[in-house]
């Protein structure tokens, strides 16, 4: 989406100002994607989100070829020119390189080595060395002399990667919005969430998605998209419609936690019905208005 693109490019602008020397492409793009996937709540970011689409793309690639990711030392040695030359005109390789860069930065920021020591201090040390003028590949080798162990741990990590709860709920609400849009375009205008669920179950609706070479279907049980992360149906106060414009589907408002709200609104572009899901974080000090999802 445009919002994710802006967050991604904003990091690149920040990096140009914050670092005296250019970051290697895997690190620059990996960090940019960490911010791309972050949830903006209106006044802060919720970082380190793992969206389901990333998991699908990465694990589908690994299932087809367990050696599909580049050797980490080779990845660290890529210059910006190498990176650009390799992915220009090759969408599949470009998608692969970006996903590997994202996964590696996420791994280094969030995981521990075999001795239980967080990798994050070493990632910060790597950034400092590059900023001090070390050649990126030399900085990588000095910070990660145990690259074979790192490679093995990273491979295990990406194989077991799972979506974060917040990102999973956001995707589910986006799928629910796709369902509501289909009902609306077929002349069915449910007055509330329960009517929408009954209409979808009665019509045995299912959606089909594709991203690159990866295809997936919506859950055959549409109740999934009316439920929380533990599979319990939301109450009508936690998940509801809010009518804004008569010519458009109602906004979908869902509160999944005390302070966070998902708010999906619909709009038209060129006669096509589109939607966007925003995340709002409410303050405990003020009245909580049920117009967003936690």
Each predicted region: which residue ranges?
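Short alpha-helical functional segments enriched in proximate histidine and acidic residues
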Residues: 13-17
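Beta/coil-rich, acidic/histidine-enriched accessory regions frequently appended to metallopeptidases
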Residues: 92, 128-294
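Acidic/His/Gly-enriched intrinsically disordered linker/tail segments
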Residues: 1, 20-192
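Short alpha-helix carrying the canonical HExxH Zn2+-binding catalytic motif
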Residues: 2-11
